[in-house]
Design a protein with these regions (language model features):
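Short, cationic Gly/His-enriched loop motifs
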Residues: 1-5, 10-22, 88-169
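Short arginine-rich
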Residues: 192-205
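Polar, enzyme-active/binding microenvironments
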Residues: 151, 180, 203
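Short helix-coil boundary/hinge micro-motifs
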Residues: 2-84
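Short, surface-exposed linear segments at secondary-structure transitions and domain or protein termini
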Residues: 56-65, 103-110, 181-191
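A short, exposed loop/beta-hairpin motif centered on an aromatic-Gly-Thr core
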Residues: 171-183
Length: 205
């Protein structure tokens, strides 16, 4: 059964020293799949929807800010669900993301990673706390300036070879070079090395 709703009532609550008005978000409850979908507002653009576990619905809807398609991630061509919160101590607004609310506070140097790389899938089963490096390796696209067509494979002008290079323990490591006519082999090798060094955080080819 699908249930449709809207939290359009005005709610004034205390957030630190900052008073905020909650404008609300449309939502859909899918009881059969035990999920809910929250509409993300976008200025003058079509809305997007984010998926959460049904047991997180009250937490998300009762949060004192409206959820928007807040930040674009070019690596996955999609938007994070979030809001902008004004902090008087900094005299500026800072982003706060829905996945942070769902998972809770992370330790220093930690990030929340979307396992399937769908950043609008905020079900707890799709979220995990990782290091900054692990979060960076779990990606779907090669760098925008990549000419080889393969992740972690680039042309080295000096040696005139295809170079396989990965970030390992925070450092860029040159692993192996391949001749000009061995590009496909270089791509296969790069994929194997990602699996070796990154494991479940290797991302897509």
């Amino acid at each position: 059964m699908l249930v449709y709703g809207n939290t359009d009532e005005k709610v004034k609550i205390q957030w630190g020293d900052n008073l905020a008005n909650k404008k609300g978000n449309n939502y859909i409850i899918d009881e059969e799949n035990n999920i809910a979908k929250i509409e993300l507002r976008r200025r003058r653009k079509e809305s997007l929807w984010v998926t959460i576990d049904l047991d997180d619905l009250d937490k998300v809807l009762n949060f004192p800010y409206t959820w928007f398609a807040l930040k674009y991630n070019s690596a996955v061509d999609d938007y994070y669900a979030g809001c902008s919160i004004y902090h008087p101590e900094y005299k500026q607004s800072r982003p706060y993301y829905m996945h942070q609310l769902i998972i809770g506070k992370q330790g220093e140097g930690k990030r929340i990673d979307h396992i399937n790389r769908d950043i609008r899938d905020n079900r707890k089963a799709n979220l995990r706390v990782v290091t900054i490096i692990q979060n960076a390796t779990n990606r779907t696209k090669k760098n925008s300036n990549n000419k080889s067509g393969y992740r972690n494979v680039s042309w080295n002008k000096s040696s005139k070879t295809w170079m396989v290079q990965l970030q390992i323990d925070g450092k860029n490591v040159r692993l192996k070079d391949f001749p000009y006519d061995k590009l496909d082999e270089a791509g296969e090798y790069a994929e194997k090395m990602r699996q070796k060094y990154y494991g479940e955080y290797a991302g897509d080819t």
